Amino acid sequence: MSVLLIAEHNNKELRPFTLNAATAASQIDADVHAVIIGQNCGDAAKALSELPLVKKVIHVEAPYYENFVAENFAPVIVKLAENYSHIVSSANTFGKNLMPRIAALLDTSQISD
């Protein structure tokens, strides 16, 4: 099964942590799909689609995703989760806030650094 990468960005460009997470995801499986969630983040989505390790980009946009609130992001990821063997995110404040919520909603444990 494919790996789902959660892209981190500022609605304009990808954050460098996303590149690190993409490399980690590709070590699990070569079929890496990425989800980018935000508002007016088309440029970041385009940059994500140009990463050689990413095979597919899922672009989700709405005004309530603009401020990167984990409580808004988690349900989106959970809906996508059944199609993936692993979900990968950066190991910073963004990922450490979001991933436990996703794990709880999926009734599973997470592996973190």
Predicted regions and their residues:
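N-terminal glycine-rich FAD/FM-binding segment characteristic of electron-transfer flavoproteins
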Residues: 1-113
